[in-house]
Amino acid sequence: MRFSVLLTGIAAAGSLAAAERSCGAVPPRAYEQEFTQALSSLTAEAASADLTAGITIDTYLHVLTDGQNGNISDQQLQAQISAMNQHYGQAGVQFRLVRATRTNNANWASGRDEAGMKRALHQGTYSTLNIYFIPNLSSGLLGICYFPRANPSQTTITMDGCMVRSGTVPGGSTTNYNQGKTATHEVGHFLGLYHVFSENGSCADADMVADTPAQSKKTSGCPSSQDSCPGGGVDSIHNYMDYSYDVCMNQFTRGQAARIAQAWRAFRAGH
C-alpha cells in the first residue's frame, strides 16, 4: 500500500509541509479471496478472535541515510515503538523492538533498489515486522507496505514490511504528519486492514469491517465532522486507516481488532 503527500513547499524551520495524503496502490486482488479461504480453515475460536487476543510482534527498525538526510535519533525510534504500542493497545497488539540498524546508502535513501535493500537488511520471518525509514520516498510518498499473503515464497517474505518516510516519526520534520501515525497506518496494512474509505467513491463496504461506517472519500486535514454516506453513521475521520492529519487519528474499532487477529492467525502466526 502506498501512502503519499502532495508537497506544498518547505517551511521556514526546514519542515516538510504536506497538504494531504493519497494512495497510489490497492491490495492485491487475490487478498480478500485468500483471507476468506484462510478464515474458513481456522477453528471457531480463532475465527472469532478479537482485541483480547494479545499479539506481540518482533520488530526491526532500519534507518536509511544519504549522508545528510534521514537521521533519526535512538530516542525517536523508541518513541515510534511507544506510539505504535499506544495506538495498537486498543487492538490487542504490541511491538517488541529487537534491533535498530543504520545504513548510509544514497540509493536506498532515495527509495531506489528496494529489492537489494531488503535482501541486505530484512530480518526474521513472515511474522516479523521490518520498517525501513527512508528520507526520500518517490513521488512524495509517506509510506509503502505489503498486505499478508497465503503461502508466501521466500521472495515474498524478504520483500515484506513497510517503507516509511523518515520525517513522520515522532518529532520529525513532516508537518501535520509527525506523531508516528504514518507507521501505524502502514502497519495496519501489514496486519490486513484496508482503508476505511472507498477507493472508487462509492458507499460500498470498502474495508470489510462491520463497525466502520460506509465512507465514499478519504479525509483531508482534521475536520470537525464528515458524513460522505448519509444514513450509516458519520465518517471515521479519527480512524488510523483514514487519511487525516496525525493529530486527528486516535482509533481502531473492535471490528478492525478482530480482523487483525484473524488475519494474523491466517497468514502470519507461526510463519
Curated annotation (Swiss-Prot):
Q: Which UniProt keywords apply?
A: Disulfide bond, Glycoprotein, Hydrolase, Metal-binding, Metalloprotease, Protease, Secreted, Signal, Virulence, Zinc
Alphabetized InterPro entries for the sequence: MetalloPept_cat_dom_sf (IPR024079), Peptidase_M43 (IPR008754)
The cysteines covalently paired via disulfide bonds are 222-248
Extract the signal peptide range.
Answer: 1-19
Give me any GO biological process, just one.
proteolysis
Q: Which residues form the active site?
A: 186
Select a single GO molecular function from the record's annotations and give it: metallopeptidase activity
Q: What is its EC number?
A: 3.4.24.-
- Can you tell me which family this protein belongs to? Belongs to the peptidase M43B family.
Purpose of the protein: Secreted metalloproteinase that allows assimilation of proteinaceous substrates. Plays a pivotal role as a pathogenicity determinant during infections and contributes to the ability of the pathogen to persist within the mammalian host.
A Pfam short name: Peptidase_M43
Name of the protein: Extracellular metalloprotease MGYG_07913
Residues involved in Zn(2+) binding: 185, 189
Compartments in which it is found:
Secreted
Does this entry carry the keyword Metal-binding?
A: yes
Which residues are noted as glycosylation sites?
71, 136, 200
Give the EC class as a word.
Answer: hydrolase
